[in-house]
Amino acid sequence: MKNIYKQSVLLVALVAILSSIVAPSANAAEKGYRYWGYFQAAPGAKTWTMAMTGPTVPIADGSVEGWAFTFSSDSIPDAATPHLAPNFSRICGLVKTVPAGKKRIGLVVDFGSAFLRPKGEKMPRNFTKCVVVDKNAVGVDVLSQVVKVRTEGSGFICAFSNYPAKECGAEITTPVALIHKK
């Protein structure tokens, strides 16, 4: 009986040791994606809403469109919104009237946190701009008036003004700076 007890204790200890060696921490090698996240704020809204569709849907006059170079993964599903809150009056306050058939849209472009920057690349400065577009314009029309947009064959947005220079929705290891924020 004593032998069986000792064997059981040894077996449990061995399993615990092997588990800690063989099974690394779930976050240690977790992968996710670095990409341009698309956010919207309806007229009068003060917070961002992640767009559930691409930038090919109509947007109302007085809206703010937001783009952020961001990251998400299985354990970090919520992409970071632009650091600047949507504020149409601050962005478009100086553009009081527009010609018939046009609309004003606030645009916020956030090039992300330094820890997301692809190696060897220089991050452009974040910016806001009031964009006057045709009344039927969609999000990509607003964006294309301000920055050079590079897309993948499927239409997935890869880069603004050549940032990032080569990648498109790259799979990367979860940045250490994000692991502690969960």
Language-model features, listed with the residues they occupy:
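Bacterial N-terminal signal peptides that target proteins for export
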Residues: K2-L11
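Hydrophobic helical h-region of N-terminal Sec-dependent signal peptides
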Residues: L10-L18
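Ubiquitin-like/PB1-type beta-grasp interaction modules and other compact soluble beta-rich domains
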Residues: K2, L18-K182
